[in-house]
UniProtKB/Swiss-Prot annotation:
It catalyses: NAD(+) + ATP = ADP + NADP(+) + H(+). InterPro entries: ATP-NAD_kinase_N (IPR017438), ATP-NAD_kinase_PpnK-typ_C (IPR017437), NAD/diacylglycerol_kinase_sf (IPR016064), NADK (IPR002504). PANTHER family: NAD KINASE. GO terms for cellular component: cytoplasm. One of its GO terms (molecular function) is NAD+ kinase activity. One of its GO terms (biological process) is NAD metabolic process. This is NAD kinase. Its cofactor is a divalent metal cation. It comes from Clostridium kluyveri (strain ATCC 8527 / DSM 555 / NBRC 12016 / NCIMB 10680 / K1). The keyword Transferase applies. Involved in the regulation of the intracellular balance of NAD and NADP, and is a key enzyme in the biosynthesis of NADP. Catalyzes specifically the phosphorylation on 2'-hydroxyl of the adenosine moiety of NAD to yield NADP. Keywords: ATP-binding, Cytoplasm, Kinase, NAD, NADP, Nucleotide-binding, Transferase. Its EC number is 2.7.1.23. It is found in: Cytoplasm.
Length: 283
């Protein structure tokens, strides 16, 4: 562990107090470590990450999602330290940083390889492609009426949905927007994709969990022009009814550092019993 990168979300740590604390904690363990810092992913890309042994992300889950797309093809593992709101992906809380870093240097951790998702569509003569860790969401614009979406799975017609949109998520993303729209919680190491209609007009419209090798094609009725595509809730692009959106499992994987098998503890504490306004959580 000789080269460590730290990507800090400056809106969460504007005075760099947490960043300096992390640097000091690392130097207390090994003074010879070379530490490079990045603010909001500036300067941190695939080429840069190849020189790093680990990327420490200081922020929340959104910072991890942003970092993940920035270093898309990189195999450098990410360690998330939560100074955000929820911190489901960012497993390490700030009060346990020193213990976590000691485990990191002793090699007492595992690396989880998380599936990513990819969407493609044609724009003129160009093929547009976007990858994400959580989800791809196709939804109507603010001024738009309820829209109709025709869904094909492996080129076979599956169903038509009329509603606000459609969420296609990885198992990692199942606890994000998908869960808010009534989709299922899926263990993050399951090799699947999940399709969830958003607020469909038809009560019988439900999520479907698919083999990750599935190719999902979605077309919008041509009379709807005000539609958008969202990747991880952070990248937005406008699409129209003449385009077919294709979604499938990405060839890239995101490597996340984990110190214990505490998935169900984290799920219970941060998702199930963290629902605001519900004393008993979401279940």
């Amino acid at each position: 562990m000789k080269n460590i990168g730290i990507n800090v979300n400056t809106t969460k740590d504007p005075n760099k107090e947490m960043l300096n604390f992390i640097i000091e904690s690392i130097k207390n363990i090994d003074k010879s470590v070379n530490i490079k810092t990045y603010e909001n992913c500036m300067g941190l890309d695939e080429n840069e990450s190849s020189s790093l042994d680990v990327i420490i992300v200081l922020g929340g889950d959104g910072t991890i999602l942003n970092t993940s797309r920035n270093v898309l093809r990189s195999k450098t593992p990410i360690l998330g330290i939560n100074i955000g709101h929820l911190g489901f992906l960012a497993q390490v809380e700030i009060n346990s940083v020193e213990a976590a870093l000691e485990k990191l240097f002793r090699g007492e951790y595992t690396i989880e390889k998380r599936d990513m998702i990819q969407c493609t569509y044609n724009e003129g003569n160009k093929i547009k492609r976007y990858d994400g860790l959580n989800d791809v969401v196709l939804y109507r614009g603010i001024k738009s009426r309820i829209q109709r979406y025709d869904v094909y799975i492996n080129d076979a017609f599956y169903n038509s949905f009329s509603g606000d949109g459609i969420i296609i998520c990885t198992s990692t993303g199942s606890t994000a927007y998908n869960l808010s729209a009534g989709g299922p919680i899926i263990h993050p190491l399951l090799d699947v994709l999940c399709l969830t209609p958003m607020y469909s007009q038809f009560f019988a419209s439900r999520s479907i969990v698919l083999d990750s090798r599935s190719l999902i094609s979605i077309s919008i009725e041509k009379n709807y022009e005000d539609s958008f595509l969202s990747i991880d809730g952070q990248k937005w692009v406008a699409v129209n009814g003449s385009q077919t959106i294709k979604i499938n499992k990405s060839k890239n994987k995101r490597r996340l550092i984990k110190f214990d098998d505490a998935y169900f503890n984290t799920l219970r504490e941060k998702i199930i019993f963290n629902a605001k306004g519900c004393e008993g959580g979401i279940l």
